[in-house]
Curated annotation (Swiss-Prot):
Pfam families: Arrestin_C, Arrestin_N. This is Arrestin domain-containing protein 2. Interacts with WWP1 (via WW domains). PANTHER family: ARRESTIN DOMAIN CONTAINING PROTEIN, ARRESTIN DOMAIN-CONTAINING PROTEIN 2. GO terms for biological process: protein transport. SUPFAM superfamilies: E set domains. SMART domains: Arrestin_C (SM01017). Belongs to the arrestin family. GO terms for cellular component: cytoplasm; cytoplasmic vesicle; plasma membrane. It comes from Homo sapiens (Human).
Length: 407
């Protein structure tokens, strides 16, 4: 049968070494070949190639239309970011051409648009890039081969906006049974807004406990995924790194003189996609017994081009290339402890009162992994994404007012 004459049919990309696929950025050329191996001569109608890049989001929400009527509302949106078509083999005359047995290679190349979105895989959306080859033959079904490729858009943290220090202050009145127990204040700052994976954030903070009970300061890097469709939004939050300080006694003050918080290997910020965003923030909070947490949030941008001392563009390009190499091949240390759930950092439940650790490990194995940050990367060896929380239990309260930095 003609179907059995095709021994191999695949798409291969140039630049792959030792089984590691290349990583692309906007404006680069994607080149490769379609491999067709025949056991005997075969007639072929056409060989066509299509490259696509698409950002897609989808989620459902339960709605109520009365006391006894419920329905499910679906939200979906997609954006095409790459679209390329090419015919690699077409018969000169007639409807088919005959290929001899053996190995046949059909080269292809196309240019990516100058601006793209980083490959991403989330619970309610994704950004995926792929190349599909289709072999048309008479009287048999078409044969298809698919190749997924990864795009990482450069995010240079060596810009004035991302090099600017970030600081803030908050205070809250501690209450218990409607009694005023004193004022707790928090101020924090970091040296810049932009960081890259593997860097350490030195956290400077001052915690002034004017209440009558001990308080516990903590800090965490939180990732927020925002999905947008038809005017609606869906958010998922995850703690990717955290630290806990020592309790601050009544009437005492504590200073953090650059407490180290290391950024794990996470995906970069995605800020310019119409249907999804990936944002990061440093959240410093103080657990106050009997009162909702005092929370201060400082924005972060996770980039791909690390901080360099001289600001040369050649250095930026080299640093970005180094990031891509580390991202694909870098040997990481042994897998660390999984970070805590987002709700454990910001929820109002006082875990300390139950005698539990402020950062318990997740117990449900089915919830410990929701898929890689990037699509279809077999060699991606970063830690699995942390657990997610559907809602933000810490809306800003009216009694939170700014306070001058003192540290």
């Amino acid at each position: 049968m003609l179907f059995d004459k095709v021994k191999a049919f695949s798409v291969q990309l140039d630049g792959a070494t030792a089984g590691v696929e290349p990583v692309f950025s906007g404006g680069q050329a994607v080149a490769g070949r379609v491999l067709l191996e025949l056991s005997s001569a075969a007639r072929v109608g056409a060989l066509r190639l299509r490259a696509r890049g698409r950002a897609h989001v989808h989620w459902t929400e339960s709605r109520s239309a009365g006391s006894s009527t419920a329905y499910t509302q679906s939200y979906s949106e997609r954006v095409e970011v790459v679209s390329h078509r090419a015919t690699l083999l077409a018969p000169d005359t007639g409807e088919t051409t005959t290929l001899p047995p053996g190995r046949h290679e059909f080269l292809f190349s196309f240019q990516l648009p100058p601006t793209l979105v980083t490959s991403f895989e989330g619970k309610h959306g994704s950004v995926r890039y792929c190349i599909k080859a289709t072999l048309h033959r008479p009287w048999v079904p078409a044969r298809r081969a698919r190749k997924v490729f990864t795009v990482i858009e450069p995010v240079d943290i060596n810009t004035p906006a991302l090099l600017a220090p970030q600081a803030g202050a908050r205070e809250k009145v501690a209450r218990s049974w409607y009694c005023n127990r004193g004022l707790v204040s928090l101020s924090a700052k970091i040296d810049r807004k932009g960081y890259t994976p593997g860097e350490v954030i030195p956290v400077f903070a001052e915690i002034d406990n004017g209440s009558t009970r001990p308080v516990l300061p903590r800090a965490a890097v939180v990732q927020t995924q925002t999905f947008m469709a038809r005017g609606a939004r869906k958010q998922k939050r995850a703690v990717v790194a955290s630290l806990a300080g020592e309790p601050v006694g009544p009437g005492q003050r504590a200073l953090w003189q650059g407490r180290a918080l290391r950024i794990p290997p996470v995906g970069p910020s995605i800020l310019h996609c119409r249907v999804l965003h990936v944002d990061y923030a440093l959240k410093v909070c103080v657990d106050i017994p009997g009162t909702s947490k005092l929370l201060l949030e400082l924005p972060l941008v996770i980039g791909t081009i690390p901080l360099h001392p001289f600001g040369s563009r050649s250095s930026s390009v080299g640093s970005h290339a180094s990031f891509l190499l580390d991202w694909r091949l870098g040997a990481l240390p042994e897998r660390p402890e999984a970070p805590p759930e987002y709700s454990e950092v910001v929820a109002d439940t006082e875990e300390a009162a139950l005698g539990q650790s402020p950062f318990p490990l997740p117990q449900d194995p089915d919830m410990s992994l929701e898929g890689p940050f990037f699509a279809y990367i077999q060699e991606f060896r970063y830690r699995p994404p942390p657990l997610y929380s559907e809602e933000d239990p810490n809306p800003l309260l009216g009694d939170m007012r700014p306070r001058c930095m003192t540290c």
